[in-house]
Amino acid sequence: MLEDPMKQNVLQPLDKAEFRNVVGHFASGVTIVTAAHDGVPYGATISAVTSLCDTPPMVLVCLNQKLGTHAAIRKARHFTINILGEDQASLAHTFATPGADKFADVAVHHRQHGPRLAEALAYLTCRVVDDLEGGTHRIFVAEVVEAQAGTGNPLSYYRGRFGHFVPYRNAMWRTTQADNAVSPH
């Protein structure tokens, strides 16, 4: 008779499909991370982006090491995070498609630190300060050197599908700018 693994107090390897299923329950925003190297623009749809701290302003971005965008960032040492609006799912699909002519018919501002998508909801221009390998991906730690936000709602990603964010009308919690603490409404 087989013993229950929980009774043995031994962690079993997690199945890749189950891991992806569980992590897929975490909703995230959708970004296109862009970079340029030797005058060639690169870009990829990335949801593994998070703020790290505000003093100095820093972010973490995780990219698959097989992506051309990954190689461009490693060489250029800077990139732009383009935060997509709720009406930009087709743009996210384009930049997620291998081999696609990603920048065709896309308004782009070519900047010193790489391309910035003109129609993005918001953007953060970043300078890499550190990076480390994490399995198939590389984690870039970067300082934000420029940022701007427009108006509108973000594109969201949840359980393998794009969607949009709908705030609660009578939210019980909000963040105050005075103390940056979450407090009751």
Curated annotation (Swiss-Prot):
Q: What is the stated purpose of this protein?
A: Involved in the degradation of para-nitrophenol (4-NP). Catalyzes both the initial hydroxylation of 4-NP to produce 4-nitrocatechol (4-NCA) and the subsequent oxidative release of the nitro group from 4-NCA to produce 2-hydroxy-1,4-benzoquinone. It can also use 4-nitroresorcinol as substrate with a rate of nitrite release similar to that observed with the two physiological substrates, 4-PN and 4-NCA.
Keywords associated with the record: Aromatic hydrocarbons catabolism, Monooxygenase, NAD, Oxidoreductase
Subunit details for this protein? The 4-NP/4-NCA monooxygenase is composed of an oxygenase component NpcA and a reductase component NpcB.
Q: What is the lineage of its organism?
A: Bacteria, Bacillati, Actinomycetota, Actinomycetes, Mycobacteriales
* GO biological process terms on file: catabolic process
**What Pfam families does its record include?**
Flavin_Reduct
Q: Which residues form the signal peptide?
A: none
What is catalysed by this protein? Answer: 4-nitrophenol + NADH + O2 + H(+) = 4-nitrocatechol + NAD(+) + H2O; 4-nitrocatechol + NADPH + O2 = 2-hydroxy-1,4-benzoquinone + nitrite + NADP(+) + H2O; 4-nitrocatechol + NADH + O2 = 2-hydroxy-1,4-benzoquinone + nitrite + NAD(+) + H2O
Molecular function via GO: 4-nitrocatechol 4-monooxygenase activity; 4-nitrophenol 2-monooxygenase activity; FMN binding; riboflavin reductase (NADPH) activity
For the keyword RNA-binding, the answer is no
Its annotated pathway reads:
Aromatic compound metabolism; Xenobiotic degradation
Q: Which SMART domains match?
A: Flavin_Reduct
Stated induction or repression of this protein's expression: By 4-NP.
> Which family does the entry's similarity section mention?
Belongs to the non-flavoprotein flavin reductase family.
- Activity modulation comment: Inhibited by methimazole.
Organism expressing this protein natively: Rhodococcus opacus
User: EC number(s) per UniProt?
Assistant: 1.14.13.166, 1.14.13.29
Record's InterPro entries?
Flavin_Rdtase-like_dom, NADH-dep_flavin_reductase, Split_barrel_FMN-bd
Protein name per UniProt? 4-nitrophenol 4-monooxygenase/4-nitrocatechol 2-monooxygenase, reductase component
